[in-house]
Every structure is written in structure tokens, then in C-alpha cells.
A protein has these predicted regions:
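Short, well-formed alpha-helical segments that are part of the catalytic scaffolds
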Residues: 14-29
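A conserved acidic beta->alpha catalytic loop
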Residues: 25, 41-49, 89-90
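Glycine-rich, basic loop-to-helix element that forms the pyrophosphate-binding segment
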Residues: 61-77
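Short aromatic/hydrophobic "clamp" motif used to bind/position activated sugar donors
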Residues: 82
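Conserved donor NDP-sugar-binding/catalytic core segment of glycosyltransferases
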Residues: 90-123
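A recurrent flexible, glycine/aromatic-enriched loop bordering the glycosyltransferase active site
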Residues: 117-118, 129-146, 162-163, 188
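Acidic donor-binding loop at a coil-to-helix junction in glycosyltransferase catalytic cores
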Residues: 156, 163-172, 187
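Non-catalytic, C-terminal membrane-associated alpha-helical segments of glycosyltransferases
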Residues: 198, 203-210, 216-274
């Protein structure tokens, strides 16, 4: 049996439609003993926990939100590295292989951002994937793969932030340690086939509720200023470090990105006034 390298933490709430595919991403490496899967559920009323348990995952219950779920997951983990993902994510074999190569290397890097590609067809999906490609390794992105000692030093996710900015907030504290963070070469797949524009805006509205608390916690931090800067979110992140060349190659996709960004911005401002 190989040495245990990685704890995969999956947070769930009524994810019966997605959890099996997510767990199956790690079948081969779990059999080899390199990876363990921990599912932390928040009061699901469907078959999520049953499916996860039948597939051999360790299943725990925790609420009220995903920060607490994630913290319980990595704390229960036995491996020196932890990866935090959602149930609607699938990790391709080449990405799993790269992750295990990185976690076995014992190098200086202590955490990784993982590029995301959304499933589906049509212009909106292409535009969203185009938008996401600009965020890799920026303050708009969020670390997902951590050396466990880094999580222990930071204390993990801030459980006072209900949902939305807890990823960004943890990144601030990880980077403050002075550790090296990198972007993986390979991506994960985010299964959002059923995610309509209406649902996207509803999710953004929900996530916006903790944003004021996050800003109050880090009022003068440069990353937070960028995250809430009109210039950076609508232009800066798309043109920095030579990324403007991508816009010239795909101008129509960029127009699609901007249209959705305007709607998201409107929803955020509307909820800030409540």
C-alpha cells in the first residue's frame, strides 16, 4: 500500500446528483492508498450521505455553512495535504496525477490554485470559461490545495463568514505566511450544466451577504481593494500581464463576459443596499 498523500474534502448539501461522479474521480488512487475522501454534509434530505458512504468515503455531519464543513474535513484528514472541492466538481485523471506529483515532491510550494473549466455547450459557457481563464492565480481566484500545516497555522476558514468570501479571506492569511503558492497546469471540471443565468444571479445574491463583513475585517488590504474595485474587476484583471492579447483574439466572447459582469454587479449593489 502506498503512502497516504492527500485528503480530499467535499462539502455537500443535497448533492445526490453529483456526489458519485466527484468521488469516482479518485477511484484509482484511493485503491492505491494515496488518497482518502471525506464528505462533510450539511443536513441533506436526499441520498447524498448514503451514496457517499456506499462509495467508501468517510461521512460527517456539520453546519451551518461550508466554512465549518471544510474545517471539520481537513481537521479529520490524515494526509499531509488537503484539497477542498465542491460536490459538483470532477477531477480529471491528468489533474489527479499532477496533484500527487506535487504533493509527493516535498518542495517549497505550500498551496495551489487549480484552474476551472465549466461543462456545457453554447455561447454562455464559452464566455464563462473565457472569463475564468483570466482569474487563475489572481486575487479573484481561490486556493484549493493546501499543505495541512498551512491550514493549521492559519486556523482554516473563517466560520464567521457565512458563504462567499471565505475562500478569499483564507488566501489572505495563507499568503501572509510568506509561503510559495502556484497555479496547477491542469484543471478541474465544474459541472454547471443546470446553472441558468437566473441561478447564477441568485447565487451571487446569496454570496453577497457576507461581503460587508469580509471588507470590514480587511478594510485596507490591497487584495480586498482589488476584489471590490470597479476598475480591476471590469478591466484590470483582463489586461494585466499581457492578458489583453486574449481579448483581441476573442472580442465577441469578451463582450459576453462584460454583459454578465454588469448583471452580477447590479445584483451585488442591490443587495448591499438591503
Amino acid at each position: 500500500m502506498a503512502e497516504l498523500q492527500l485528503t480530499v474534502v467535499i462539502t455537500t448539501k443535497n448533492e445526490a446528483a453529483n456526489i458519485a461522479a466527484c468521488i469516482h474521480s479518485f477511484d484509482v488512487v484511493r485503491e492505491q492508498g494515496k488518497v482518502e475522501v471525506i464528505v462533510v454534509d450539511n443536513a441533506s434530505t436526499d441520498e447524498t450521505k448514503k451514496i457517499a458512504a456506499e462509495l467508501g468515503a468517510a461521512v460527517f455531519d456539520k453546519g451551518p455553512e461550508r466554512s465549518a464543513q471544510r474545517n471539520l474535513g481537513w481537521q479529520k484528514g490524515r494526509a499531509p495535504w488537503a484539497m477542498i472541492i465542491d460536490a459538483d466538481m470532477i477531477i480529471p485523471p491528468e489533474t489527479v496525477e499532477e496533484i500527487l506529483e506535487k504533493t509527493a515532491a516535498r518542495g517549497e510550494t505550500a498551496a495551489y490554485w487549480i484552474p476551472e473549466v465549466r461543462t456545457g455547450t453554447g455561447f454562455r459557457v464559452k464566455a464563462r470559461n473565457f472569463e475564468r481563464s483570466f482569474y487563475n492565480g489572481t486575487c479573484i481566484d481561490a486556493l484549493r490545495l493546501f499543505r495541512k500545516d498551512v491550514l493549521e497555522k492559519t486556523g482554516g476558514y473563517d466560520e464567521n463568514l457565512i458563504a462567499g468570501p471565505e475562500d478569499w479571506e483564507l488566501d489572505i492569511r495563507v499568503l501572509a505566511l510568506g509561503v510559495k503558492c502556484e497555479v496547477l497546469e491542469h484543471h478541474l471540471i465544474h459541472n454547471e450544466r443546470q446553472l441558468t443565468l437566473k441561478r447564477v444571479l441568485e447565487k451571487k445574491a446569496y454570496y453577497s451577504h457576507s461581503m460587508a463583513e469580509y471588507q470590514a475585517k480587511w478594510p485596507n488590504h490591497s487584495a480586498v481593494k482589488k476584489q471590490f474595485s470597479f476598475y480591476y474587476r471590469y478591466l484590470g484583471v483582463f489586461i494585466e500581464k499581457g492578458k489583453w492579447r486574449k481579448i483581441l483574439r476573442h472580442p465577441i466572447l469578451f463582450v459576453g463576459v462584460m454583459c454578465e459582469r454588469v448583471l452580477v454587479g447590479f445584483v451585488y449593489l442591490k443587495n448591499r443596499k438591503k
